[in-house]
Amino acid sequence: MDYLYSALTSKMNWIALLLAGLTFCCKVSVHSCLDYDDSYDYYEEEKTETIDYKDPCKAAVFWGDIALDDEDLKMFHIDGTIDLKQQTHGRQGHTSGGLGEHVPTKKRGSLYLLLDRIRRLGFESWPVNSSKDVSSIKTGIRRVNSARNVKSRVPRAATSRAEKIWPGGVIPYVIGGNFTGSQRAMLKQAMRHWEKQTCVTFIEKTDEESYIVFTYRPCGCCSYVGRRGNGPQAISIGKNCDKFGIVVHELGHVIGFWHEHTRPDRDDHVTIIRDNIQPGQEYNFIKMEPGDVNSLGEPYDFDSIMHYARNTFSRGMFLDTILPSRDENGVRPAIGQRTRLSKGDISQAKKLYRCPACGETLQDSVGNFSSPGYPNGYPSYTHCVWRISVTPGEKIVLNFTTMDLYKSSLCWYDYIEVRDGYWRKAPLLGRFCGDKIPEVLVSTDSRMWIEFRSSSNWVGKGFAAVYEAICGGEISKDSGQIQSPNYPDDYRPSKECVWRITVSEGYSVGLSFQVFEIERHDSCAYDYLEVRDGLSENSPLIGRFCGYDKPEDIRSTSNNLWMKFVSDGTVNKAGFAANFFKEEDECLKPDNGGCEQRCVNTLGSFKCACDPGYELAPDKKSCEAACGGLLTKLNGTITTPGWPKEYPPNKNCVWQVVAPTQYRISMQFEAFELEGNEVCKYDYVEVRSGLSSDSKLHGKYCGTEVPEVITSQYNNMRIEFKSDNTVSKKGFKAHFFSDKDECSKDNGGCQHECINTIGSYVCQCRNGFILHENKHDCKEAECEHKIHSTTGTISSPNWPDKYPSRKECTWDITATPGHRVKISFNEFEIEQHQECAYDHLEAFDGDSDKTPILSRLCGNKIPEPLISTGNKMYLRFISDASVQRKGFQATHSTECGGRLKAEARQKNLYSHAQFGDNNYPGHTDCEWLIVAESGYGIELTFTTFEVEEEADCGYDYIELYDGYDTGAHKIGRFCGSGPREELYSAGDAVLIHFHSDDTISKKGFHIRYTSTKFQEALHTRK
């Protein structure tokens, strides 16, 4: 009995150690935890998601970023000794354990309550902060198992439970509605990365019962291991988890992988430094038993994307918890990379899903493949599978160029099967053998499956095939996807794709965009997507779209829709992704959709609405008296229901303010507090010019920032307030007042432009003119301009009309120190001359016409952009007495980087042009080369330094090199608060490289630099 008590005590100790993950699981940060909010608002998650999925954030236990449910706990024999259900004490985030994902100290939580409960059950022998070795804890487990005569079963490096494997390696998925276009593209890139390297296939969910849901959850980065079955399961890509490598890691769990460092042979390869582990996180470093783990014959993989980093769950950012052993060269391998799948990851996944020994996933738009050994014969008993996956909306054209297989009746022995889809159960396009080359095969969608088997000893050449993805074509089905060529990567140049979509008779075609990013142009002249209401290019035009704003949902009037995508040969963007489906107008039914007042048809559904002064009742069909109404006073006050107390949930208030003709209405908010942030997805107020819900939108507002004064374009204004069913705030109080628009009659008497103001108006002159003393007329202005703004437009005098004769204009443009001036011409038409001797525009590389000339321009051809070498540029336009033309219009902006000269006087360098006003932009790569005179070095002083922090400075950083290029001695890579002291070069040049990624941005940096006499060696001043 004493032995059993001891064994149970040991088991409970191990259970408590494992369950240290209860609300103790790590808070996530992408290379920095600075922006992770401990008081996470649950309602900032994806509220609109209606899928009842298996939520990893509600797991019984967490093991790092792995969610364990009751079924998983049985694997640990945690099955009834005590009630181990999770007790929530605050919301926690999780980390994938990758390189640079620092985890701060954890708060006390339910672990301590659990230990209390263990003690109350009579297990008093283990103190809370026990340093008992993990292996001894496991000894207790083995004793319990032995006593029960039950074979121990614990998680493996790759799951060994057949029900956790996705059948056929096919994983259906849904991407939740809260992700941006760039995040959606990144999620698809991560899935395509797994597809490219293995035989796992991700497909958009159709009618599958089990599938994964990408969602934004409060537990950060978190997932179950393998397939849960019996419905959807979530993979949480929460705050700061939207990095390619982190998503690849989390997908590794979905596919069926545990963490690499839990293997039984890990002590031969790494050392766990227990003293550096955060209290309560020891369970994350439990090692499995040799008899229980099957790593599928793969050696220990330091490079695995499933391996923890050296400092995961460390007490301090620079303290190791996992120390890799040195290799034969005495070097410790890097661990914890979150960049791509390792060779070991790929090999293990192929074994787990029993991928055929030959074949691959082909994702390029063109490609080729052939049988093993081609053209020298293929071996017997061979099995190969090729999966071709191109962009949805494209079709695959497969052409066999050679065919020499053993011929048999019904191609029974050696054969090739081609299927129209993503797997072996897709419709068969053909089964081939012998030496007759098949006809060209064309898929109906964007995937094709090619399987080759040989079972004879006959030796033939084999086969060879080429394929090509073609965009556009006839699409006759009720739902599907269309994406720009090469999505989620940038679309290809010089493409033209035409799709003709037909759905069932009696329906219209609905088109909804998830992602849209096409080269921007005012008239969409370069790259664009054109949509027409019919089947031909002569059908009525619905719209021609470009830029970065997603088009509104589109509905055709018939069961046909025509789409054309065009890209030119220059700028390429991310493109678009859209879903199409058959659409029915439920509002045309005799019962008006069951709505009491108004029925509003929406894509895929409908909704009821009410007349002004009414709102929907809880049944969402009938209407009842509401807030809002028609207001005809010249001034008044509007407040949310219940003001100044919190507004109620599920409210929809519409105020329609109408003023006399020639009046404009202004709205000024006195107080403002609504749920939400910049997204305004939950509670919000919309202000529009006009009375309808689709009139011009001035803004959609939420949060606590008081909006600026809003003035209508017409004599009416619509204000709509909506609240959802959860969080309520104080609301808003606003005053409206009407003002006569003097500009609406005779342009206010202004010669050029009339600008209406509250209570009055002002006249304004076009470019090249100034206002006359009478405040209405315009006269020709002096033409000297000093420009200090980071961006703007400049143009010739009198633009867009012809410039005057005998005119001289100058522009003295100054950019932020460390940034160069860039001039990009939008239009250009100046009198032509071979040497530009008459009318011309000159650009000088400095602050006057005494500096080096960059260019002298005339004619009708738009010049290439002009870029200064320093932070100043001087432009001079001169016209003579004869011919006048339209002139020019150009945009001035800034370019970072360049060559800078260090002198005795101190100079400045800023990280970005809008330093002090805005954080630095994303996707930045800038290089500055600072050069001193021969015999002098360079002193750098960082007066401000605030760059996204991360242990290895992997995301945003500044690199310094003691020389002219990156081959020189590297002084260091800095992020966070940067170097604390002055830096000196050992030579006469310093190269500065600044990089930022596409997520978190900070204030940036300000460097003062000067030349100084050489120091004996590179050093910092203490």
UniProtKB/Swiss-Prot annotation:
A single cellular component GO annotation: extracellular space
Species of the source: Danio rerio
Cofactor: Zn(2+)
Catalytic residues, chain numbering: E250
MF-aspect GO terms: calcium ion binding; metalloendopeptidase activity; metallopeptidase activity; peptidase activity; zinc ion binding
Cofactor details (free text): Binds 1 zinc ion per subunit.
EC category: hydrolase
Residues that, per the record, bind Zn(2+): H249, H253, H259
Function: Required for patterning ventral tissues of the tail. May increase bone morphogenetic protein (BMP) activity at the end of gastrulation by proteolytic cleavage of chordin and release of BMP from inactive complexes.
Tissues where this protein is expressed: During gastrulation, accumulates around the closing blastopore with greater expression ventrally. At the animal pole, expressed in the ectoderm flanking the anterior neural plate. At the 10-somite stage, expressed in the developing tailbud and cranial neural crest. At the 20-somite stage, also expressed in the hematopoietic system.
Taxonomic path: Eukaryota, Metazoa, Chordata, Craniata, Vertebrata
Secretion signal span: 1-32
Proregion positions: 33-156
Top-rank taxon, per record: Eukaryota
SUPFAM superfamilies: EGF/Laminin (SSF57196), Metalloproteases ('zincins'), catalytic domain (SSF55486), Spermadhesin, CUB domain (SSF49854)
Annotated S-S bridges: C199-C355, C219-C241, C221-C222, C358-C384, C411-C433, C471-C497, C524-C546, C587-C599, C595-C608, C610-C623, C627-C653, C680-C702, C743-C754, C750-C763, C765-C778, C783-C809, C836-C858, C896-C926, C953-C975
Keywords tagged on the record: Calcium, Developmental protein, Disulfide bond, EGF-like domain, Glycoprotein, Hydrolase, Metal-binding, Metalloprotease, Protease, Repeat, Signal, Zinc, Zymogen
Protein name listed in UniProt: Dorsal-ventral patterning tolloid-like protein 1
Membrane-spanning parts: none
GO biological process: blood vessel development; determination of ventral identity; dorsal/ventral pattern formation; embryonic caudal fin morphogenesis; embryonic hemopoiesis; endothelial cell development; mesoderm formation; positive regulation of BMP signaling pathway
Domain called CUB: residue spans: 358-470, 471-583, 627-739, 783-895, 896-1012
